[in-house]
Amino acid sequence: MFDVTLLILLGLAALGFISHNTTVAVSILVLIIVRVTPLSTFFPWIEQQGLSIGIIILTIGVMAPIASGTLPPSTLIHSFLNWKSLVAIAVGVIVSWLGGRGVTLMGSQPQLVAGLLVGTVLGVALFRGVPVGPLIAAGLVSLIVGKQ
């Protein structure tokens, strides 16, 4: 039997590789492996917990330089004294807020996820963009279409 979903996933993975977006490509390949093996029984859990676990791992990666000492406390303190660092802090707050809106939107309108992924891959492939992630893109979409 022909599996259209598998074909779509393979197409998105190919776009990920073509656009040098290995994060998207590898993620989709992992999901393909889950789909075609007995691991598919874990999909409900992945759908419920995957985003939260991903955000935890991302936060660990962002906080690692502080925890390891690579980013010393003096640098953190000085970030409140330099205007460029203050702008960076403000932008970080805005982007985090957008990401929060994106999580809400993706949860309430999951049909938008494919469009966000395709748009991200096309932006990387056609405009030499950087795959900053579907959460921020979803946050921007939420400003246009609303959160619900």
From Swiss-Prot:
InterPro entries: UPF0756_TM. It holds the Pfam family DUF441. The chain crosses the membrane at residues 14-34, 51-71, 86-106, 121-141. Signal peptide: none annotated. Its main location: membrane. One of its GO terms (cellular component) is plasma membrane. Keywords: Cell membrane, Membrane, Transmembrane, Transmembrane helix. It comes from the Bacteria. It is found in: Cell membrane. It is a multi-pass membrane protein. Belongs to the UPF0756 family. This is UPF0756 membrane protein YeaL. It comes from Shigella boydii serotype 18 (strain CDC 3083-94 / BS512). The lineage of its organism: Bacteria, Pseudomonadati, Pseudomonadota, Gammaproteobacteria, Enterobacterales.
